[in-house]
Swiss-Prot record:
Name of the protein in question: Hydroxyacylglutathione hydrolase, mitochondrial
Modified residues (N6-acetyllysine): K116, K229
Subunit note: Monomer.
Biological function: Thiolesterase that catalyzes the hydrolysis of S-D-lactoyl-glutathione to form glutathione and D-lactic acid.
Keywords for this protein: Acetylation, Cytoplasm, Hydrolase, Metal-binding, Mitochondrion, Transit peptide, Zinc
Needed cofactors: Zn(2+)
Assigned protein family: Belongs to the metallo-beta-lactamase superfamily. Glyoxalase II family.
Reaction(s) this enzyme catalyzes, per UniProt: an S-(2-hydroxyacyl)glutathione + H2O = a 2-hydroxy carboxylate + glutathione + H(+); (R)-S-lactoylglutathione + H2O = (R)-lactate + glutathione + H(+)
Amino acid sequence: MVLGRGLLGRWSVAELGAVCARLGLGPALLGSLHHLGLRKSLTVDQGTMKVELLPALTDNYMYLLIDEDTKEAAIVDPVQPQKVVETARKHGVKLTTVLTTHHHWDHAGGNEKLVKLEPGLKVYGGDDRIGALTHKVTHLSTLQVGSLHVKCLSTPCHTSGHICYFVTKPNSPEPPAVFTGDTLFVAGCGKFYEGTADEMYKALLEVLGRLPADTRVYCGHEYTINNLKFARHVEPDNTAVREKLAWAKEKYSIGEPTVPSTIAEEFTYNPFMRVREKTVQQHAGETEPVATMRAIRKEKDQFKMPRD
């Protein structure tokens, strides 16, 4: 689907969203809106910690993490470096740090260019395949972005070196944040390219699932609607799934992100976080959480997405 600039000049983003939703063209709309610069960014002010969501490529997110106390900033997965530099300048912050969740091109592919644009950046990641890497981290490694504390969480499965970054402001009541790359999505999880169901179970339930319930979840892609359609298939009577899906469709229709969620919310509608629930196990025909994880991931990989 191609949307001409003349069409965009006559219709608002919301009107285009409504038309494409009626025609079952949601994914095409999102890609088109992005390429014409209309997929919206969002700034989440959590207190001292500020997070700007930067749409990238077709459905990726980069995240500018800002410490308001020191005006120091980090960027998560900067696949479009020029956009990152311009956004940092807009906020008047000093970009010091790159937090790379994993080595895939749509997350790490901008690292080399960014370090040329901004010499002296510290580039963190858990995999030697990450471009421009200066600081290799492991599980529970820590670092600072200004006054913000960052803890590295190893979550191998999507890739063997995948890291999630858990960010807190010490001695502050503001909620934490976790940048989950392609491990945890809103209502979903990443494909098991280099790992197993057991590893994803540990990543979701034993690592991320044990973070504070109010932790904001900033994931790597805008996959929420399709994830919730699968969640609805798994648990058709789950009210939380249906309510979140209706909300996400509304956000999508006006070009707004569905991120962040929270850890607490994910336990109510994400089937991969709910593999200990009897309803999910019964759908999978299993009685054990890891086997359920394996079964529903295999099913989702082959799932024909409804067009509603």
